[in-house]
């Protein structure tokens, strides 16, 4: 089995630095749309310049995502096969046992991941659900892995409980722009999402927040999503950019596929508007050829989800990823002591 070259973990930006970025530029949707309109080469050149100011351009973080509770979600997100509103043939499952999750985390670490994400298909977790999840967080952190969970909407006290368990990141995506949002989901408002993100931020947990493109939105609406993310104060430390994976039985089956260059443009625009964020090349990567993935790295993506599965959709084989990164001369960040090597963006002394 080929080996991936490793590089030291980057230190995440401080809150002061991210706030300075936000103060320097409040992004209007029109300004973000203007970035999209740049000639492709000019846009990528600018994004790569910004990327090199803040990161090693030849290093990516390998993340692994595990569905710890699959299906049965009450939300009606039009893209999601885990919704009870859609007939996708997906069977709802109970929350995994703690030791099962920790075993998967050990394998992820052995395969080179430095970040382990856990996702549960809930509208919002009950307090009793958090007890085993806190054990999962503690166990994964004890392995030296960065931790992230996505559990749906949170109340303030729940976010604080996760923070006390040592959680590094909470993922809660905006999905799309405020203007297009009503076309995608009706069971949760945009403000609901923003409220959860506020609870996460107030608890001192790093924010992981991005969206999905290829939902049928316009370029202007894609610009609206990026502007919404970039204007958070501070903007998210982690920004996953997903390309719609169409699943039979969901309302978005048959949606016209997004132009591949438009996806690369979205990565580049995210990098320019959120220069210190980890921009994560997320769902939809299996449908991308190697040249397209390479362009995404050039545009500023510096993290991939690594492993054969992303929640309920497939992902490129790990060995294929190893070979691609080696051919591109890209190193995976090295597993080092966590979380000391990655600074909390809120000035806390460790999670």
UniProtKB/Swiss-Prot annotation:
One example GO MF annotation: 4 iron, 4 sulfur cluster binding
Biological pathway: Cofactor biosynthesis; biotin biosynthesis; biotin from 7,8-diaminononanoate: step 2/2
Catalytic activity line of the entry: (4R,5S)-dethiobiotin + (sulfur carrier)-SH + 2 reduced [2Fe-2S]-[ferredoxin] + 2 S-adenosyl-L-methionine = (sulfur carrier)-H + biotin + 2 5'-deoxyadenosine + 2 L-methionine + 2 oxidized [2Fe-2S]-[ferredoxin]
Cofactor: [4Fe-4S] cluster; [2Fe-2S] cluster
EC number, as in UniProt: 2.8.1.6
Annotated [2Fe-2S] cluster binding sites: 117, 148, 208, 280
Keyword annotations of the record: 2Fe-2S, 4Fe-4S, Biotin biosynthesis, Iron, Iron-sulfur, Metal-binding, S-adenosyl-L-methionine, Transferase
SUPFAM superfamilies: Radical SAM enzymes
The record's free-text note on cofactor binding: Binds 1 [4Fe-4S] cluster. The cluster is coordinated with 3 cysteines and an exchangeable S-adenosyl-L-methionine. Binds 1 [2Fe-2S] cluster. The cluster is coordinated with 3 cysteines and 1 arginine.
Top-rank EC class of the record's enzyme: transferase
Subunit structure: Homodimer.
General function of this protein: Catalyzes the conversion of dethiobiotin (DTB) to biotin by the insertion of a sulfur atom into dethiobiotin via a radical-based mechanism.
Name of the molecule in the record: Biotin synthase
Species of the source: Paraburkholderia phymatum (strain DSM 17167 / CIP 108236 / LMG 21445 / STM815)
Gene, per the UniProt record: bioB
